[in-house]
Amino acid sequence: MKKKFIKMLCSIAIGCMISTSYSIKVSAFSNGNTKTNPNGEFKSLSLNSTNPYKTKYSFNDLNKLSNKEILDLTSKIKWSDISDLFQYNKDSYTFYSNKERVQALIDGLYEKGCNYTSTDDKGIDTLVEILRSGFYLGYYNDSLKYLNDKSFKDKCIPAMIAIENNKNFKLGENGQDTVVHALGKLIGNTSCNDEVVNKTIPILEQYYNEIDKYSKDRLKSNAVYNFMKEINYDISQYEYAHNIRDYKNTPWSGKIDSFIDTISKFASISNVTKDNGWIINNSIYYTAKLSKYHSNPSIPHSVIDNCIEIFPDYSEQYFTAIEAIKEDFNSRDSKGNVIDINKLIEEGKKHYLPKTYTFDNGKIIIKAGDKVEESKIQKLYWASKEVKSQFHRIIGNDKPLEVGNADDILTIVIYNNPEEYKLNKTLYGYSVDNGGIYIEGIGTFFTYERTPQESIYSLEELFRHEFTHYLQGRYLIPGLFNKGDFYKGNNGRITWFEEGSAEFFAGSTRTSVLPRKSMVGGLSKNPKERFNADKLLHSKYSDGWDFYKYGYAFSDYMYNNNKKLFSDLVSTMKNNDVKGYEALIEESSKDSKINKDYEYHMENLVNNYDNYTIPLVSDDYMKQYDNKSLHEIKSDIEKAMDVKNSQITKESSQYFDTYNLKATYTLSSNKGEISNWNYMNNKINEALNKLDNLSWGGYKTVTAYFSNPRLNSNNEVVYDIVFHGLLSHNKNSNEKVEVKEEPEIKDKDSFENVIYEKENNDSFDKANKIHKNQIVMATLDTEDYRDTFYFDALTSGSIDITIENIHGNSDAFNWLVYNDEDLNNYIAYPTKKEDNKLMGSFKVHKPGRYYILVYKTSLNKVNYKLNISDATNMAPVIKKIHEKENNDSFETANKITLDTLVLGNLDYKDVSDIYSFDIENTKDLNIKLTNLNNLGIAWNLYKESDLNNYIAYGAKSDNAIVGKCNLSPGKYYLYVYKYSGDKGNYSVIIN
């Protein structure tokens, strides 16, 4: 089973919520207010903030006040005047554990809700934030779990209705807008009923009628947005908590039609502007999400259909509607017609990312918008080499922790601008409420070009940060993000280090890591406001964004003043020593000397701010140099570094060729870990300096590192050393770069068009899986003389196979095809030879698994491309998934959807699989179970109301078990079982 985990390592949050519609959408549903620290979202909007007594309060102060005094105080202070709001400590526990006090605050909100005016919010904004802080802490802390109980949250509903019944409940003066905004936030942290929901309609109508004016008003816009987001959030949480499958049976079903219809009105605004685009997007999103609670879901569904017609192709609104059709309506329009969503998405990728660049023999691929300058693409490549060189020096390892992961090939997706980046959520399915994001499970990070007005961080800075996350996942932290041991039980255990060190390594140069002016400028000038070591070392994403800057400062402190701590931390990570790491963190967070030195280092950084710059790659990388032979370069580097017997290899990129020189360096004496490191660091830098002083300018592109320290048989310390630099420019450097057109995708499976083989695949049981119309890049050499691949044929037909020797002729290798049922006798071989290609075809007489064996027939190394294609008409486009074990009981059944092809397998231990699916409307369904191997298999269908008696079964038809049945609304279980045969694969589809 293939698992994908998202490394959501975002460099920079996109600021204003209403400036980015997709960021609104993602945070609205994925990041409910109970899961994120909400007090960083806006500055206080309370009007009456005069306070003659104090400028700041803490829960310690509030605990000394009576309930009446607290309620009076909320009218005099801003919520930001409470220093530890949303923070769990003994004082906040004391405050919120007093149920009578919390109830008094809720009662106070009711009274204030009855009495606020158009110009005086009566402190409602501050009081709401105090209440939200309690519900937030109740979500995360069992000691306050009563605050997370829905029955207690419902106690806020009378106060909400009181606010809505006040004659001043409308958009207008600042006091009114503040109250409306606060109500929306409170709904998200508590609950709502249909009355609360429907009483928000006048606000939505008012905003709709004045949209040209109000869309320019941030407070009014956020107030309206909160109603959409938080009401949907509360309903979806109820749905999740009660395992709702019949959406007609909820407290809101059929009771909030007018609310949904009012939201949907915004989706029909065809005149999109920079001010109203966000609410149109959100209207599309929430209309689709809430449609299932409408008494006639086809009404909001048809609104989404209309969006596809009225908005321009490739526009943000168009793709928002496309995604809604896919996610909320099973890729069908309101009349039941299937829409080929995958085709539209692929067209969108080609539109927004028409350029493809390759580097390092295809190990780095950049997909970019047509407005991203090609010179910047090249500079990003060289920036990666600077970051990589310093990372490996400090981490001390350049061997991948796991072989065969997706990050064997790094893919970088760069959109033209922030506006186009919003489409990434639809085109690739990943969050866009950030400046960039690395997805470790697919070895890809996404970002966008930006102007100084759009971000204080340049594209190269962001790239350096995200590239560090790639290096962390590949060389430092075992396991995939959020899945490895360091994330178990506490997924924020190393967050401060991942983000802080990523900001640190973004300052890498050829010889060191320099302070970044953009980071130092974010450190508070007031020492009391800075993170101390204890606070930083326990920081998580839920704590906001500030820990990025202080994590950077701590990494810079370790690099310059405490290399031993830096080394100890990375050693625990490389060794997967979670307990050792936790012990080191606890010790360091309480070490007064570490904290003092860290704070002193921060003070020096702040004081020297004007002396810093932002490290970026030099223009030396972009200059043209005379060609120099590998032999000459090898000789010069060996002389500069005082080594012999190095190995130098060439790698090709789109614009230039580069080289890697590898050797070992043995220390004359062992002076301890840190002294050895300092010696090697100086030695490498001295070699780079010597090369710089030679006449050939290409040496100014050289980066180098040392890693993997170890003792040899003579008890001497040995390091691996690696030098990388420019070898020569190719013709693309002097002409417009040719854009690589994406191959036409005929098979809409969600697979990459170009993949690389994963060793070891030299036997049938280790074969790599491939797909039709996929290009496989692979290599055969003296140690790897054969490769095997397999594919599953779901129907009969003719298969074409082409294998091309990239750098030689077709006499150097051969291929054969085998059927899974007989691995001793091949069934096909090449029948046509054309220059460097071997081609052939064979007839698939019945569905099943087929293997391709590629083997060498000469002593030469062979780099080849393999492609298989279907010579018959392509099968209908369908989505494919794989079963997930254990699914052998009704309780553990895999949930599937209609029109999805499920691939499963059975063997002597696993003799049955069970799947569940939901039917919303009475319909006729076809069930087809296809035997991909020589198994005796069958299926039965059960309804949830009677799991003892099946209601349908299949009949044999060729190599499939098929059946047709008429099903009424409800939940059903498909029971697939084996009655003969050893082991094999099958596919099943319900449509």
Swiss-Prot record:
Region spans: Helper subdomain: 619-731
SUPFAM superfamilies associated with the record: Collagen-binding domain (SSF89260)
Record's keyword annotation contains DNA-binding: no
Binding site for Zn(2+): 465, 469, 499
Collagen-binding domain 1: region residues: 755-870
Subcellular location as annotated: Secreted
Annotated region (Collagen-binding domain 2), positions in chain: 878-991
Purpose of the protein: Clostridial collagenases are among the most efficient degraders of eukaryotic collagen known; saprophytes use collagen as a carbon source while pathogens additionally digest collagen to aid in host colonization. Has both tripeptidylcarboxypeptidase on Gly-X-Y and endopeptidase activities; the endopeptidase cuts within the triple helix region of collagen while tripeptidylcarboxypeptidase successively digests the exposed ends, thus clostridial collagenases can digest large sections of collagen.
Identification of the protein by name: Collagenase ColT
Record organism: Clostridium tetani (strain Massachusetts / E88)
